């Protein structure tokens, strides 16, 4: 009973510190929380939690504040992600429903997430490696060169030069393009490469075998491209309100390292909990500039029938934990949404906002409104 009560005390300390950003003492815990024990007992529990590394006392006469270990315990035991209010959901739908392209939706999402959380928001566009083929066109541009224009399911347009020994007739190139579009629609780029090689080996395509092989090579090259096309960031001005000004310079440096940031948040979005979000705290990120920060990330992507948000409320919250797990497991992440803030951020609210925006973008992709 003593240990379980101590964990209740820890939870209360974390909640109060997140709210006030001031060291928390036993007197305020006794007054504000129904812990069922005296102030002296709570004081002993807090001392024990400090010995165990969950709390720290910044000054002898001050109360306690959570450590990374304390925040991690708190986050891992959040029973549920607090659902957004109906007004918040309506606001998200209203603001994002005006998006006319995926790029527009991603830019709007970054701005909105930053406004909701009061923190830095980062939204990545999908990489080619996670995309599926929607359409390809091949256009001769020189005696031995074609330009392959590849359009993916996320609306991304990629161009790739194809070098061949000799140029076939335009009609033969168009026939190959039509066959590739028929057989590769909806396939990943790596699967598309395999299919194109099979087409090249089949009867009737001898004259365009060199073109097909070059196109397959291009698909394979694109399939290895894990980089996000764009990284949209909003809300760096919120950092100016930080109480720890000494932490700002390394944090700004970390935000400038977009490759490191993308890798961190992409990995985190793939290591989500049952609520569909991942959280990294301080030194867990192994990035000096983020030592005093936390990151919340969630993937967005393709959704199957069971996971698609229904009706006119794509950010509508699931009613049960099993529904949340179903939606999470039924979505194949192809990019991420994230929020970066102080370690004393409101984790429950931030996790809810990140998840809601990720679910909206998943619905947006499912509707196919991705063309610029």
UniProtKB/Swiss-Prot annotation:
It holds the Pfam family HrcA. Keywords: Repressor, Stress response, Transcription, Transcription regulation. Residues 300-334 are annotated as: Disordered. GO terms for molecular function: DNA binding. It comes from the Bacteria. Signal peptide: none annotated. One of its GO terms (biological process) is negative regulation of DNA-templated transcription. Belongs to the HrcA family. Negative regulator of class I heat shock genes (grpE-dnaK-dnaJ and groELS operons). Prevents heat-shock induction of these operons. This is Heat-inducible transcription repressor HrcA. It comes from Bifidobacterium longum (strain DJO10A).
């Amino acid at each position: 009973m003593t240990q379980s009560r101590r964990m209740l005390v820890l939870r209360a300390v974390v909640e109060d510190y997140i709210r006030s950003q001031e060291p928390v003492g036993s007197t305020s815990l006794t007054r504000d929380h129904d812990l069922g024990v005296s102030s002296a007992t709570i004081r002993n529990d807090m001392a024990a939690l400090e010995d165990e590394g969950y709390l720290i006392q910044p000054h002898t006469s001050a109360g306690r504040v959570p450590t990374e270990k304390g925040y991690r315990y708190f986050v891992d035991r959040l029973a549920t992600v607090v659902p957004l209010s109906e007004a918040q959901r309506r606001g998200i739908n209203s603001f994002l429903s005006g998006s006319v392209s995926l790029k527009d939706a991603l830019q709007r999402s970054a701005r909105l997430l930053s406004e909701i959380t009061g923190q830095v928001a980062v939204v990545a566009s999908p990489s080619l490696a996670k995309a599926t083929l929607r359409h390809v066109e091949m256009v001769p541009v020189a005696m031995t060169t074609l330009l392959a224009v590849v359009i993916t399911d996320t609306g991304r347009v990629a161009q790739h030069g194809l070098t061949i020994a000799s140029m076939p007739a335009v009609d033969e190139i168009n026939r190959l393009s039509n066959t590739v579009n028929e057989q590769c629609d909806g396939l990943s780029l790596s699967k598309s490469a395999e299919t194109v090689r099979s087409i090249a080996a089949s009867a009737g395509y001898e004259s365009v075998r060199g073109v097909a092989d070059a196109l397959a090579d291009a698909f394979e090259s694109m399939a290895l491209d894990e980089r996000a096309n764009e990284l949209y960031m909003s809300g760096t001005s919120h950092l100016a309100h930080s109480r720890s000004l000494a932490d700002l310079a390394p944090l700004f440096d970390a935000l400038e390292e977009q490759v490191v940031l993308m890798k961190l948040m992409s990995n985190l979005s793939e290591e989500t909990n049952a609520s569909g979000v991942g959280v990294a705290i301080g030194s867990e990120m192994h990035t000096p500039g983020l030592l005093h920060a936390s990151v919340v990330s969630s993937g967005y992507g393709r959704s199957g029938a069971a996971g698609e948000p229904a009706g006119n409320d794509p950010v509508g919250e699931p009613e049960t934990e099993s529904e949340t797990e179903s939606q999470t497991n039924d979505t194949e992440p192809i990019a991420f949404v994230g929020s970066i803030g102080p370690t004393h951020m409101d984790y429950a609210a931030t996790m809810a906002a990140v998840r809601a925006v990720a679910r909206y973008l998943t619905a947006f992709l499912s509707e196919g409104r991705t063309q610029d």
